[in-house]
A protein has these predicted regions:
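Short, polar/flexible loop-turn hinges at active-site or ligand-entry regions and domain interfaces
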Residues: 56-65, 82-87, 188-189, 258-260
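Hydrophobic (often cysteine-bearing) scaffold residues that line and stabilize catalytic clefts
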Residues: 64, 68, 72, 122, ...
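C-terminal, charged and often intrinsically disordered regions of DNA end-processing helicases
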Residues: 5-66, 293
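Mg2+/Mn2+-dependent nuclease catalytic core
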Residues: 149-246
């Protein structure tokens, strides 16, 4: 793990957060005036999906894969709450069942979710993800500075950008590392830049709020035991800032015109809104009268 260890606590504006429930409470002036990496990606992938999630706030059934990600994230967060010597594979596996029981109680639709999914195999695969985590790094060798950290920054002539960082490590030398866990497989080389957008989004916030560019961005892919590592430059973060402002400008135009165009792609296979999507012969519901706040 090198020299990254517990060094200091960065003080950002914090909010109540719960991975188990999957709910985020964000106290901001208006959802129209804020942007997270997830919502930015929604708009880039399909403006209509952004509308369904942000304006219409349509419910989406939970998926077994997403729930597994929530479970593993919660276990890793709890693991770092233990003393270093207790952060072992056996201890992580011991945490799985009680964490799953809590998650099951907090999540609606679990029974329906596992009608077509083998629960036993699903839990086995979650154990496998934990094993792969320990093959990627040794959590006994360092203490994180922050876990599930909410960060935000008000862009000039733009939105309040915000997000949750899975883990923030600060070295004794002051170098910052942003770490994000992914329970899926690592992207092919052609798609790495798209995956790094989220991490540069976070790095931009830290740079603008702290005046220091993070040294390393690290994505840990537990699905195939791979790392994606990047050392961001000022030029890359300035480019990311411009990209965010461009996305934001397009979103504002959609608000003004009421046009939220669907964009057909392979991602449509996982979309919960095909029945009301024009690309699949559906009709979206009327836009709410008030969409600005």
């Amino acid at each position: 793990m090198g020299h990254f260890c517990y060094f200091q606590q960065i003080h950002f504006h914090s909010f109540a957060y719960s991975r188990l429930i999957g709910e985020i409470a964000i106290s901001t002036p208006s959802r129209r005036n804020t942007l997270s990496p997830s919502r930015a990606n929604d708009y880039m992938n399909c403006p209509l999906l952004y509308r369904f999630r942000v304006i219409d706030k349509l419910p989406e059934p939970p998926s077994a894969d997403a729930l597994k990600g929530t479970l593993v994230h919660a276990i890793l967060e709890d693991l770092f709450g233990l003393d270093r010597l207790e952060r072992t594979p056996d201890r992580a596996h011991d945490l799985l069942q009680p964490t799953w029981e809590q998650l099951k109680e907090k999540t609606s639709g679990v029974t329906e979710m596992f009608q077509n999914v083998d629960l036993e195999q699903w839990l086995i695969s979650a154990h496998s993800l934990l094993d792969r985590y320990f093959e990627l790094e040794d959590p006994k060798s360092f203490d994180p500075t922050d876990l599930e950290k909410f960060v935000e920054y008000q862009m000039e002539d733009g939105p309040m950008i915000h997000g949750y960082i899975d883990r923030l490590d600060i070295a004794p030398t002051g170098e910052i590392r942003i770490v994000d866990y992914k329970t899926g497989k690592s992207p092919k080389a052609a798609y790495e830049e798209k995956s790094l957008f989220q991490m540069r989004f976070y790095a931009l916030i830290l740079w603008r709020t702290l005046g220091k560019i993070p040294k390393r961005l690290q994505l840990l892919y537990l699905g195939d035991k791979n790392r994606l590592i990047s050392e961001p430059t000022e030029a890359e973060l300035v480019k990311t800032e411009g990209k965010i402002l461009s996305i934001w400008s397009d979103i504002q135009l959609s608000y003004e015109t009421g046009l939220w165009k669907p964009k057909k792609s392979k991602l449509c296979d996982w979309c919960a809104h095909q029945s009301i999507c024009p690309e699949f012969g559906g009709t979206p519901p009327p836009l709410p009268v008030q969409v600005s706040d």
